[in-house]
C-alpha cells in the first residue's frame, strides 16, 4: 500500500481560475467555443467536488489545478459530471512513485515487489497521478495519464473491476468485446513485427482489455488520427460511448485553418 506523506498541500477553493490560460494547450485547441464553455463549467464543478492534494513537496497553483480539472472533464464532456462520482481526492506526486505490488500467479502463489507507477485508480478510492506525466498530457501525442485513469474509473462503473467494457447497452457488449480484442491482436501483431518501442500505438494496450480501453481512450482524445483509420469499427463505438468525435473536430479545425490561409492571399 502507498505510504502517505505527513505533509501534503491541498488546493483551496478559488473563484478566479485562469481558464483562458488553462485552455491554451494542444489537447484542447480543437474544441469549439461552446465546448470550451461547457468544459469550463464542468471543471468548476469538478474543483468544487474533488480535493487536489499535492504530495512530497509538489506545489499546486491555480493554473495547474485548472488544467488538471479540464483534462479530467474532457472525457465526460457529453456524459455529465456524475460519471466522475465514486472518488473525492486526486493525489499528485511530483514524479512517478513507488508502490508495493502484490499478485497471484497461475498456481496460487502470491508475489510481492516494489514497482514504479505513473498513476493508479480504484473503484472506491482516489486517483493518484504524477506531475511529470501530467505535463506530458497537455500535447496531442497519444499519451495522456489523466484520461487513462479517468477511463479506468468509467470502466469500473460497469462492475467491481475494470474489464475494458464500460457502461454501455447490453446489446452492444458482444460487438464491443469483439472489436476491442481485434484491436489488441492487431497491436500485438505490430509489436511482434517491429518491437514495442517502434509500435505506433502504446504496447500497453495489448496487455489487457481494461488497459486497451484506457490506452485507446488516450488516443481517442489526443491522437484521433492514429486511432480512427486503423480501428474504424471500434472508433465508432468509442464515439457512441463518449458522445464525441475528436476526429471530426480535427477535420473542422484543419479546414478552417486552410480557409484562413486562402483568405489571406
Swiss-Prot record:
GO biological process: proteolysis
Lineage: Bacteria, Pseudomonadati, Pseudomonadota, Gammaproteobacteria, Enterobacterales
UniProt organism field: Salmonella schwarzengrund (strain CVM19633)
Binding site for Zn(2+): 111, 148, 152, 211
SUPFAM superfamilies from the UniProt entry: Metalloproteases ('zincins'), catalytic domain
Similarity remark: Belongs to the MtfA family.
Cofactor names: Zn(2+)
PANTHER family reported in the protein's UniProt record: MTFA PEPTIDASE, PROTEIN MTFA
Name of the protein this chain belongs to: Mlc titration factor A
EC numbers for this chain: 3.4.11.-
Subunit annotation: Interacts with Mlc.
Regions that span the bilayer: none
Domain of life: Bacteria
Stored Pfam families: Peptidase_M90 (PF06167)
Cofactor: how bound: Binds 1 zinc ion per subunit.
GO MF terms held by the record: aminopeptidase activity; metallopeptidase activity; zinc ion binding
Described function: Involved in the modulation of the activity of the glucose-phosphotransferase system (glucose-PTS). Interacts with the transcriptional repressor Mlc, preventing its interaction with DNA and leading to the modulation of expression of genes regulated by Mlc, including ptsG, which encodes the PTS system glucose-specific EIICB component. Shows zinc-dependent metallopeptidase activity.
InterPro entries: MetalloPept_cat_dom_sf, MtfA_enterob, MtfA_fam, MtfA_N
Subcellular location as annotated: Cytoplasm
One Gene Ontology cellular component annotation held by this UniProt entry: cytosol
Keywords in alphabetical order: Aminopeptidase, Cytoplasm, Hydrolase, Metal-binding, Metalloprotease, Protease, Zinc
Amino acid at each position: 500500500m502507498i505510504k502517505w506523506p505527513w505533509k501534503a498541500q491541498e488546493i483551496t477553493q478559488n473563484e478566479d481560475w485562469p481558464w483562458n490560460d488553462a485552455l491554451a494547450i494542444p489537447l484542447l485547441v480543437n474544441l469549439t467555443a461552446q465546448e470550451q464553455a461547457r468544459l469550463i463549467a464542468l471543471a468548476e464543478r469538478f474543483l468544487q467536488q474533488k480535493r487536489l492534494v499535492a504530495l512530497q513537496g509538489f506545489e499546486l497553483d491555480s493554473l495547474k489545478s485548472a488544467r488538471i480539472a479540464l483534462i479530467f472533464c474532457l472525457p465526460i464532456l457529453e456524459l455529465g459530471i456524475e460519471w466522475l462520482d465514486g472518488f473525492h481526492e486526486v493525489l499528485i506526486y511530483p514524479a512517478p512513485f513507488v508502490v508495493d505490488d502484490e499478485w497471484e500467479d497461475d498456481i496460487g502463489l502470491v508475489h510481492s515487489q516494489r514497482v514504479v507507477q505513473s498513476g493508479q485508480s480504484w473503484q472506491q478510492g482516489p486517483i493518484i497521478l504524477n506531475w511529470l506525466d501530467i505535463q506530458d498530457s497537455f500535447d496531442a501525442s497519444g499519451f495522456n495519464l489523466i484520461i487513462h485513469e479517468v477511463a479506468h474509473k468509467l470502466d469500473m462503473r460497469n462492475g467491481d473491476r475494470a474489464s475494458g467494457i464500460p457502461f454501455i447497452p447490453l446489446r452492444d457488449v458482444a460487438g464491443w468485446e469483439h472489436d476491442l480484442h481485434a484491436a489488441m491482436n492487431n497491436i500485438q501483431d505490430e509489436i511482434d513485427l517491429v518491437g514495442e518501442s517502434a509500435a505506433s500505438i502504446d504496447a500497453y494496450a495489448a496487455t489487457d482489455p481494461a488497459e486497451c480501453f484506457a490506452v485507446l481512450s488516450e488516443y481517442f482524445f489526443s491522437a484521433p488520427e492514429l486511432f480512427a483509420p486503423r480501428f474504424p469499427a471500434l472508433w465508432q463505438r468509442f464515439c457512441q460511448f463518449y458522445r464525441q468525435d475528436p476526429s471530426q473536430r480535427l477535420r473542422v479545425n484543419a479546414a478552417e485553418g486552410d480557409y484562413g490561409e486562402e483568405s489571406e492571399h
